[in-house]
Swiss-Prot record:
Transmembrane stretches, start-end: 195-215, 329-348, 353-373, 397-417, 426-446, 450-470
Entry protein name: Non-structural polyprotein 1A
Gene3D superfamilies in alphabetical order: Trypsin-like serine proteases
Family: Belongs to the astroviridae polyprotein 1A family.
Site feature (Cleavage) residues: 168-169, 508-509, 795-796, 915-916
Keywords tagged on the record: Covalent protein-RNA linkage, Host membrane, Hydrolase, Membrane, Phosphoprotein, Protease, Serine protease, Transmembrane, Transmembrane helix, Viral RNA replication
Amino acid sequence: MAAAAASALGASAPKALAPADGPIVAGLDKLVNLEGVHDLFEAMRGAYGEDPAWKGLMSCDVVYLKDITTAIGVKDTSVGIFRKFSDGCSWCPTGAECFLSMKDLAYMKAQSAKAQRLTASLATTSNLIARAMRAESELKRARDEERKVDARYKDILEHSLAARKALQKELDETRERELHLLKELGKRSSIRTKAFSFFDWLFMAVVFFLFLHYTSAECVKPDFGCLVVNSNLPVPSLTFHDVMARCYNTFGNIVLSSQIDAARLREECEQSANKFLGTHIGDPAHKVWCENRLETLIPVECDSSEFLEIFTSNLNAFMVSVSQFYKTISYYKLDALVTFAFSAALATNKLKMVMVLPLLLVALYLNVPPITVTIASVIFQPLILPFVGFQLVFPNFLPYNLFVAWVWMVCQAFFSSDGVKLLVSVSTALVQVVFLAVWSISVIVLQQLSIPMVAQILLFVATLTVSVGVKFANSTITVVHPDGNTEKVSRVTLVRQSMAKRISQIKQSLTIRGVIPSGPNRFDSIVVVEGQGGSGVGWRFMNSIFTAGHVVQGSKFVTIKSESTQVKVKVKRVIDLFECVDTLVEIPLTKEFQHIKPLRLAKKVEDSYLQLCAFKPDMVEKASYQGWCTIDSGFIFNSFNTQFGNSGAPYVDSDGRLVGMHLGSQGVISQGVVLVDTLKTQFLAQQSQIDDQLMERIIEGTKVSHAAILTELDRMRTKVEEVALVSARVNQLESQLKDLYEFSSNSIKCLSDDIEKMVCAQLFDEINLQSVMEKISALPPTEKLAKLVEVFVEQKKKGKTKRTARGGKHALGKKYLSKAHFSRMRMLTEEEYNKMVEDGFSPDEIKEVVDQLREQAWQNYLIDNDIGEDDDLDWYDDMLEDERLNEEIDRRVEAALEDRGELAYQKIRRTFVDQALIHLITLKKGNWQTTKVECQPEREEAYKEQFQKAVKQEDLTEGTSYAIYSAGDATILIENKEIDHTEIKPVTTGAKTVQEYPKDARTTVATFDDNKKDIVKTKRTTEIVLEQRKKTCRTCGETRPHNHKMCRDRHTRRFCFWCGVVHSDVEGHSRDLKCPKCSAGFANLREMEQHAVTTCSKN
């Protein structure tokens, strides 16, 4: 009970109080009046303490002692009266409202409400603590279940590891057998290779000896002149001068007979003789001289034939014989007979041969190409051959034949098979029917086109070759890379990649300085980046935008522009570049720029022609620069002219891959930096840690049957569900426990300061130290202290507030609080203390008032708990003993921590008063400003004058300004006044140096003698308003927010089955949406279809 006997004197009540039956005025529960109440209570308790009426009065929440014989009490909503009569005391629990005035009754109800709130808070706190303990018990039980599940899974894992070892052993044995088989295969291959090599050499020897030709005596080379050999090769003829050059005074030269023109040689010889001899033309002596000269130059003529000419003549004769044989076969239709025999031989069994022979006879009789029957004998089963014969005889009944064949084959496959074979048999039957349809159409086409037999065979072979070749080219092969990774690709893809790589290598090898190669431009990968200091070029790599550091230097937010879209984005991080004064800035990629194509890193970095993708000076139109670039020590040097705003632009090679980034121009040389190695290290691919486990499970799965796998999956799925339920329950309990603790702490904070401290101390003793103190209570005093030190060392390591020895003693021996608790209890709030200071109370007067309030609280506590004051007269000695034990505990805790090598001190949180001499704070909408001064005691008065000038008398909105001046014990706090921050300036008189650091906050440091410093720090913070992102719809052109996908669908033109024309949803239907039966109208086709299917009565 909060004994409110001292709070119910109506004479001191303010005049502006509400009626008793109205709402209780705020603040009445804080009023108290101690004048004479204590003496009156002592007198009445001494006179009526044993009377039941007095005990009934003391059971009330609030008691008002009117005089020595009359008292009024309030319990819940009832007002009772205590009276002293001559024959005794009486207590009436109801009906005493008439004895109080309206104001006194309001006081009493306010005090009663306070007591009820306290009782309800204590009950709620106890309930919450009980619920928290139950939740903690359930959490412990759930964790035990989780540990059991973990143990079961551990057993499963051990079993899996054992199975893995067995599989590994079996795999090793299989590999050994495979190596043995490979050796045997190698031996056989070696023998086969030697045999093939022998036949190759034999063939080459035969060909070599066949090409040799016979020689005779007349084909021997003469000692003087040339040897003429017969030949029909088409070569140009020789002149007389050529013959002289080759055959005069030479040995062993050979001339072909096709090069010798006798008439031409005689004519040219006579002309040469007339010219050199100087005689007249036509002199007979010249003819004789020329004939003798030619006989001398060409003395021998060889008339032998070579093997090639003999072989050619024999081949021509063979071809003539083959042509005559073919004409004979065509005349007597012997090709059909050959095909007949060939088809009969292709039959795989006797039944098929018996069924194919009639088909061949029918084909010969009906003049059907025998090649078709040959193909049918190979691809069709015996059961479908009757349908093949029917199709040969009656080609016009193809649909009926296919229908009957389909029914017959499916029924036969169903009734003749069972189990898994049933599906295979039915599928095979359907394939046979499809082949029958294709074969029948092919027969009709061949009959109509009258294609020769040879052409038919070639057509069949070509079709088979193309189909098999395409299938082989598209087949998948497994490529094993040197790092152990495997990749499945098709043969066509592999060949295409190899050719592309080879072409790229050839292209790079042909790159010559001076000839600029053509390459793709990457304008679709760059954007404009604007910062506080200027603008530049950005480019996309993976899922980020990158640019140079000096483009956005000093900017936390940058603007990215691309065409008509611009977004303001926060910088993600800054990457340092090796041996470079500039940096690389990474900006996150937003959803508005997902269409920007990313760049890929170059595979090879070397001196070559590079392309710089950038913007023109207007930062709208895109431009590219291309030229020879030299790479040296990670930097790129080029000689082409760049412009302002090209910083951050990417360098790409002839394949469009990223090489580096442009930094700027110095004179006639432009400089960039290579980024390939930097970006590779910044975005390392995460290595998979479960590849081996997956491979082991795959190998294990190949050894397990399908049924076993399904059983194991069901079992594992059940265990996973159990784990999920346990985890969900654990999370739920932890969440409930957290909510309970938060709600409990919030409830405790609502209590008054004095009761809160008592309740917290009691809860701490009951919850945290109960189990520990029960063990310590049985120890001797010295061992108790050592045990307490161990407990407090662990609490100090965890950062918890050290519990005093007073608390421990209270939990061990005392049942009630001592007076020492009330001697340090806080009785005044900051508002009450400031009010008393403003009213002119001195510190001694305030201390006296606080001591009286503490004494009154102590007396109320004694009355509520029915404790005599003589029961606890040694409270002062207990307080001194507690302080002594505190010091001993601190000393032992620090010594224990030092022995462990751990720090014994913790960082103390400094308040505004502890931080600086002056602290000014101004809060306004959109921006706020703070000023902080730290100085030496010699200049406190000078800064105090600045503080008084800075704080103006104009009032501001509550909570918008704070001014604090703290010098030793003197502290001044002024709120909600206009503050001029410019009045606070550093006092530099006598300072050695004055330094100013103009960063985000302007800091001025003045250094005096003995390195003493005064620091004045002023900071203005402006709220950054992000620019609203706007995006124009490409379909309708509007900028208002709406679903762009739905808008695009509504504007897409499609064929409408109802209207019979192409239109979009926006254009609407050209035909009214009415039911053809009942003429009911609808808003869309879906409603009309639903009506026609379900609700239309006439349909």
